[in-house]
Amino acid sequence: MKAKISDVAKIAGVSPTTVSRVLNNRGYISDETKKNVYKAMKEVNYFPNDIARSLFNKRTNLIGVIVPQTSNPFFGELVLHIESICASLNYKVLLCNSLNRIDKEEKYWEMLIRNQVDGVIAVTYNRGILDYHNQTLPIVAIDHYLSKKIPTVSSDNYSGGIQATELLISKGCKHIIHINGPIKLETPANLRRKAYEYVMNEQGKTPITYEISNTFDRKIQQEVICKLFDEHPEVDGIFASDDLVAASVIVEAQKRGKDIPTELKVIGYDGTETSQALLPGLTTIRQPIESIAKKAIEILTKEVEGEFNDLPLETSLPVKLLEGTTT
C-alpha cells in the first residue's frame, strides 16, 4: 500500500500539518523535527506529490533551459552545472535542445509555458521569434541579448579578445586573422571581434575577420577555414571563436604542412573540460562556465521570488588565459 502523509507523521511523532510544513518549507521548523520527518519518509518510502505541492505553493519548481545543442562542449558543460545547482536548490530542469532551429525553439517555448515553469534560462540564438519585451515569465539570457529588460550573463568577452590578440602579437605573429560566429547576431561574443580589431589597429596591423554563418554546421565551418588558408597563405596567427573551431584550424593547417606553433599559432576560446582533455596543448581563453551558471540561476531565482530591485541587466565575469603549446 502506498504510504501517506499520516504514516510519516505517526512515525515522526508529529502532526500531518507539521509534515506538510516541512515538505513545503513553510514557517519555522526545528532541524531536529525536519530530521525526524525525512527519516520517517525514508522508512515508509514516502514521496511527496509534486503536483499537489505546486498547487499549494503556486510554483512547479521547474526551470526551463533552452540551448542550441548539448553536444557542443560549452553548452554541455554549462547544462551540467545548471542542473547540479538547480538540484541543490530543489529545482528540476526541463532541457530543450533547439538545434538552432526557429521552429523547434518556438515549440519549446510553448511547451515550457504549458508546463508552467517558474523561469527560463535562454542560451538562444534566434532573437526575434518571440516578443521578449512582453514576456511575463522570469527569463535570464546567457551570452545573448534578448531584450533590454532581460538580464544577460556572459564572460568578459572583450578582455578575452584583448588577451588573445595581444598574446599572438607578443609571440611575433605578423598576419593575425580572427574567426568569428555570425556577426549579425547581437551577442556579447561579438566583443571578442571588437577587442581583436582594437588591438590590431593600435598595433598598426590590418584586422581580418572570417565569419562562420552557422558555427554548428561542420561543413560550413570547414569551408570557411579552407577559404581563409587559400586566400591568406601568409597567415601566422589565428584567434578562433571557440575551441572546436580552433581544433579544426589545427587539423587543416597540418594537412597543408604547416607546423604548429612554428609556422602558425592558434588560440581558441571556451576552455571547457572536454576540449582541455582532448586537446591539452591548446592555448585558449577559459570561460568561467560554472560561475556563469551560478550567476544566471541566482538572478533567475530572485526574479521568481519577485525580487526585481537592483537586478543587474548585464553581468560580465572574468576569463583566464590558458597558454598551451599551440602558441
Where are these regions (language model features)?
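Short acidic/polar active-site loop segments enriched in Thr and Asp
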Residues: 15, 118, 173-175, 236
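Short acidic capping loops at alpha-helix termini that bridge into adjacent secondary structure
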Residues: 175, 207-209, 259-265
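Hinge/beta->alpha junction and helix N-cap segments in small-molecule ligand-binding domains
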Residues: 68-77, 95-103, 153-163, 179-226, ...
